[in-house]
Each structure stands twice: as C-alpha cells, then as structure tokens.
Design a protein with these regions (language model features):
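Catalytic cores of nucleotide-sugar-dependent glycosyltransferases that transfer UDP/GDP/TDP-activated
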Residues: 1-348
Length: 348
C-alpha cells in the first residue's frame, strides 16, 4: 500500500527530545516500512526515517530560532502534498484540522489522527462543519466532547517492542517526565515526593507559554533537597531515567488524550501512580501497572505500596497491548476500510 504520513513540523520525526505526536508518527512510519509498505513522510528536514522524506521545513520549527510564523511552513507542506496526492492509496494526517478544507475536495482516501484535547469550545462549530472528515481517536475518553464526529476507530499508541529494555530492579527515586505546565502538575509530583520521603527527578521541557507558571509555581520548589531538575531527555537517556525509577508520577489535572509516557514506563517495567483523568483508566491496569488516584492523600498511600507491584507484569502489559506492531495492525484495518469505501464511491 502507498501511504503518506503528514506530520507536524514543530519537532523532527522522531523528535530529539520531547514531542509525543512526532514520536508516534515515527514509530508508525518505521513499522509500516518494515512490513513492506511504500511510505512517504512529510515532516521537517532534520527527520530520520527509512521512508521517503519530503521536507516541509529545513529543520524542526521549535528548534529553529529564526522561524517566526510556523503556520506558513505547514501550509506550504500541505500544498506540496496536495500536488502529489494522487500518488497515494491513503493519506494519514497528524496536523489537527489544518488540511480539512483541502482534503474535503480531494479524491485520495484520507484519515486524521487527533492527538490533542478536544474539550475546547472553539472546536465544536469546526467539527459540525467538517463532520464528514474521517478521524481517529487515541483513547475513547478523548472523543467524548465530539460524539458526532466521523470516528473511524480508536487506536492506542504503540512503541517498538525492543525500544526500551526491561529493568527488573528499581532505583530509589520517583520520575516525572513530560512538560512543565499547569495541566501536568509537576508541583503535585513534588508534594507527593515530599510527603513520602523519596527523591524526585524531573525530566521536562518548558514551552514559552508555560514560563510564567514555571516561575511562579515550580521554580520556588526546585531548591528542595529531594528535587532534581535535569531538563529534557531522549533516547537511551530517557530509558535509563524511566527504567531506574521507583515509580512514574503522572499527577495530571486535565483530560489527558493518551499519555505516552505511561506506556514508555511500562516498557521499562516501571509502575505508575496517576490521577484518574482522561485516558488513564484505559491505559493503566489498576493494581497491575500501577495505581489510579483522585487526590493527594490517595497518591501518597499509593506511593507507599507501589513496591508491591510486579515490574515484570508492567512489561508484560506493554507487550500485550502497546507495541508498534499492534498499532500498525489497527491502522491498516482503518486504511483498508477507507480505501475500499473510496473505491466503491468512485464506482470502481
């Protein structure tokens, strides 16, 4: 099958550090190529892939200090795709809704994975207008605000089976990995660690929009002797960070669409303490891969008993549910359905 993957340009595919969407696009693309499909990846020029790469920008836009208007690069990339859309059996978009006016008018089968939160009022009229656009959710919880969208299915993220190795013996610290932002609540993670008496290591990026939150809420807590902020991590450094952790703290305060770090932790054998929001009940298995909580008191109690969980079971759940092979199998089912429907509509 000839497949186009159209990625955001904010990060490279895969990203050097933080970047959940681009990371998933990379895993999906590489597994499709491994299975023999003809894949073209539209992404930033510093992306690394075994697919055919069509650069939409010279490098990832977040790391390009000279880039002022990121949207301009995305529009040019979409026009580039449109000019060769007939070369593909299926086009898979990961750029939110930017392409909807274009894809509504093209004949190539297409589907869009929605990677972000959908409980934003501004999205309601947009999805009423573009209710014909075929979309995929990354959790069932994510799609709840848009029940009437043209859902083709839910496909949970998956990562390569051998990307992270199993770490049977934990270290002596809690891990927090992600973005420093109000909805990720690293301040909660610090308080949990303080009450339990276990050190916390924070590996996270800080976007410009979150600098005020960092300065006002998080930075005053960093001098605590049990807190270590190490910045962004990637690759083997990330595996070591997660795999050696006593547990991953995921104290979110928003309707998390998926939470990629949870399955990355599972792949290492590291259990999770997560607030029961958004996708968390779909991704985690209570009393097996960790504990779900609703408040600080429950989080502290969970942290005190997390050592009783099997790290091997965490790894097993990852292998059973969250590999790239399973993700590709699910997407191929959707691609096939879209292509067949398009052929039937064209009278083929």
């Amino acid at each position: 099958m000839k497949i186009a993957q159209i990625a955001p340009l904010y990060e490279s595919v895969p990203p050097k550090y933080y970047g959940g969407t681009e990371r998933v696009v990379s895993w999906l693309t590489e597994e499709l190529v491994r299975q023999g499909h003809d894949v073209t990846l539209f992404a930033s020029g510093d992306s690394e892939t075994s697919a055919k790469l069509v650069p939409g920008s010279p490098r990832s836009l977040r790391l390009d200090k000279g880039c002022i208007d990121q949207l301009a690069h995305h529009i040019l990339m979409l026009e580039n795709f449109y000019q060769r859309a007939g070369d593909f059996d299926v086009a898979h978009f990961h750029v939110d809704y930017l392409h909807y006016p274009l894809t509504r008018r093209q004949l190539t089968s297409h589907v869009t994975t929605l990677h972000g939160r959908l409980d934003i009022p501004d999205l309601q009229p947009l999805y009423r207008e573009f209710s014909d656009m075929p979309v995929v959710s990354i959790s069932n919880a994510q799609r709840e605000p848009l029940p009437d969208a043209n859902w083709q299915g839910t496909v949970y993220h998956g990562l390569p089976r051998d990307l992270f190795s199993f770490h049977p013996e934990p270290g002596s610290y809690f891990a927090f990995l992600g973005r420093i932002s109000p909805e990720k609540r690293v301040d909660r993670a610090i308080e949990i660690a303080r009450r339990v008496g276990i050190p916390l290591k924070i590996a996270a990026k800080i976007d410009a929009i979150d600098q005020q939150y960092f300065k006002a809420v998080v930075e005053p807590l960093l001098p605590e002797p049990f807190v270590e902020y190490i910045g962004e991590v990637g690759g083997r450094e990330k595996e070591k960070f997660l795999g050696n952790a006593f547990a991953l703290l995921f104290p979110i305060d928003w309707p998390e669409p998926f939470g990629l770090v949870m399955i990355e932790a599972m792949a290492c054998g590291t259990p999770i303490i997560a607030y029961r929001r958004g996708s968390v009940p779909e991704v985690m298995e209570e009393d097996e891969t960790g504990f779900m909580v609703t408040n600080l008191r429950e989080a502290v109690a969970a942290a005190k008993k997390i050592s009783g969980l099997s790290r091997r079971r965490c790894r097993d759940v990852f292998e059973e549910r969250f590999t790239a092979e399973r993700m590709v199998k699910d997407y191929l089912r959707i691609y096939d359905g879209m292509a067949q429907a398009n052929t039937a509509a064209a009278g083929g």
